[in-house]
């Protein structure tokens, strides 16, 4: 089980939002590359970047900060990136410039054929971010909830050849009130590709609970506010996950 630190970028800074609301941002650092190196030094094996401005604008907006992070990490661990990726040119640009996995969210739902084409052009490098509220998929930086069922859509995307599904429970993201483990397990059970959990990780107890169900196909968990505010110690979390892995 991978514990994956999140670096959310807004106006070139590392921030955390509550429930995806741009106006409710806490700035944690003005130099995101320093944050990336901090997690690398603490044993992170993958990083999760989000271009928040990009997610709302529908096109890349934090290019400078992303470049700085890629240069600082220098290929030592994989970087996954989402936010504002709505065309193949952007996918190709990021994958050619040090990003290991591109995460497609809104565009997977709203632009017919785009996800399918991306998976075909860049096999093994496309993940889908499914943001859920009450089992329905939300789009446009979480500002709109659609009628699409999360599991139905995930199955369809699995057939396209996506590498993994990142499942975020919007109601819990940035709120530090525990993961929606039931919904994540339900999704993982319906799929054969890996599911990465996200939204609401609070403490080691959440990591322990998630590790107990990882055999359902949950391969990682993305954490943000908890590791920045200190309710979860990143090193301890990864050590616990490794310990529970080896005990199996």
From Swiss-Prot:
Its EC number is 5.3.1.16. It holds the Pfam family His_biosynth. It is found in: Cytoplasm. The keyword Amino-acid biosynthesis applies. The keyword Cell division does not apply. Keywords: Amino-acid biosynthesis, Cytoplasm, Histidine biosynthesis, Isomerase. Transmembrane segments: none annotated. GO terms for molecular function: 1-(5-phosphoribosyl)-5-[(5-phosphoribosylamino)methylideneamino]imidazole-4-carboxamide isomerase activity. Gene3D superfamilies: Aldolase class I. Pathway: Amino-acid biosynthesis; L-histidine biosynthesis; L-histidine from 5-phospho-alpha-D-ribose 1-diphosphate: step 4/9. One of its GO terms (biological process) is L-histidine biosynthetic process. One of its GO terms (cellular component) is cytoplasm. It catalyses: 1-(5-phospho-beta-D-ribosyl)-5-[(5-phospho-beta-D-ribosylamino)methylideneamino]imidazole-4-carboxamide = 5-[(5-phospho-1-deoxy-D-ribulos-1-ylimino)methylamino]-1-(5-phospho-beta-D-ribosyl)imidazole-4-carboxamide. Its main location: cytoplasm. InterPro entries: Aldolase_TIM (IPR013785), His_biosynth (IPR006062), HisA_bact_arch (IPR006063), Isoase_HisA-like (IPR044524), Isoase_HisA-like_bact (IPR023016), RibuloseP-bd_barrel (IPR011060). The active site is at residues 8, 131. Belongs to the HisA/HisF family. PANTHER family: 1-(5-PHOSPHORIBOSYL)-5-[(5-PHOSPHORIBOSYLAMINO)METHYLIDENEAMINO] IMIDAZOLE-4-CARBOXAMIDE ISOMERASE. This is 1-(5-phosphoribosyl)-5-[(5-phosphoribosylamino)methylideneamino] imidazole-4-carboxamide isomerase. It comes from Nitrosomonas eutropha (strain DSM 101675 / C91 / Nm57). The lineage of its organism: Bacteria, Pseudomonadati, Pseudomonadota, Betaproteobacteria, Nitrosomonadales. The gene is hisA.
């Amino acid at each position: 089980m991978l514990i994956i630190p999140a670096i959310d970028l807004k106006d070139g800074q590392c921030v955390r939002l509550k429930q995806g609301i741009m106006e409710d941002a806490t700035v944690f650092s003005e130099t995101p590359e320093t944050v990336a190196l901090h997690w690398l030094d603490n044993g992170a094996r993958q990083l999760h970047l989000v271009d928040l401005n990009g997610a709302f604008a529908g096109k890349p907006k934090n290019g400078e900060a992303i470049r700085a992070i890629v240069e600082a990490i220098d290929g030592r661990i994989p970087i996954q990136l989402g936010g504002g990726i709505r065309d193949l040119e952007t996918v190709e640009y990021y994958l050619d410039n040090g990003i290991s996995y591109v995460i497609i969210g809104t565009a997977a739902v709203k632009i017919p054929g785009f996800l399918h084409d991306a998976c075909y052009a860049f096999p093994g490098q496309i993940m889908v971010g499914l943001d859920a509220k009450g089992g329905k998929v939300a789009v446009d930086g979480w500002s709109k909830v659609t009628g699409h069922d999360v599991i139905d859509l995930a199955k369809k995307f699995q057939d396209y050849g996506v590498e993994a599904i990142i499942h975020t429970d919007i109601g819990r993201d940035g709120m530090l009130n525990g993961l929606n483990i039931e919904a994540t397990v339900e999704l993982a059970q319906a799929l054969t590709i890996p599911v990465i959990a996200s939204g609401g990780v609070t403490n080691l107890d959440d990591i322990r609970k998630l590790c107990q169900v990882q055999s359902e196909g949950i391969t990682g968990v993305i954490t943000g506010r908890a590791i920045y505010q200190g309710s979860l110690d990143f090193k301890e979390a990864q050590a616990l996950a490794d310990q529970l892995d080896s005990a199996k």
